[in-house]
Amino acid sequence: MSQTDTCMSFLWAKKKEQNGRFFWLPLTLHLKDTMGVMDFLWHHWVSEGQKEIIIHALSDTGEEVVDTAQRLACFLAGIHDLGKCTPVFQTQKGYQNSPDLDIALLNRLEQAGLTGISSLNLDMAPRKRSHHTVTGEYLLQYFGVQQDIASVIGAHHGKPIDKEEVVTKLKLYPRDCFQDEKEGPCQRLWLAMQKQILERNLKKTGFIDSEENPTVDSLPEISEIGQVLLSGLVIMADWIASNEAYFPLIPLEENEPEAMENRLQCG
């Protein structure tokens, strides 16, 4: 396993302490859960009328436009929490857990190559400025995704984000997304993880070039009404995938559920 894969496997999306035991939800697992829920919603819940609106909102007009709409919905679900792959999120303290859980998660990232992450001091101002919806939209634009699609990620907690706020403010605070202000091993590792999450989701949903390499250039353009509907679907998929009764957190010492293949079906 590469350093990027190892470090990425230790990123958390959710964490809690219950009856003295530590539990967490790996970020990569939560993204898989949410994409799986979105696929189910598209095939079993979204009405034909809603699908038609989304389809007509796309720039694609070919015979495969229906497939493109479904793949785009799944891509957005699988990338919705990209903003959690940032130091400003990973250093957040839990509200109701022992500091030992926060420390344990940070120590694993430190040992995987993010030198200094366990002692990184980002005050509360960046947390308000750099909510993971904001950093998610910013990172997608950083990697070349157009604003129409990136804005869906920025809105997945119910509030669209002003483009100028996303781009201008975060450019001034590179530590929020990349840990260091200048290029170095930690900044390169964060960029590698963020890019890998993006590219794996592009490839999984079929947004590839003629040589089957993932590319943001294969993503369609989408009108405002389509953005609104897709934002709503991402919110719903995320809400369902965040329900611990259906998609429980796992013990801290585990990296994925023992019955991974049954997780989505049970959910």
Report the location of each language-model feature.
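Accessory nucleic-acid engagement/destabilization modules that flank
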Residues: 3-8, 12-19, 27-41, 45-267
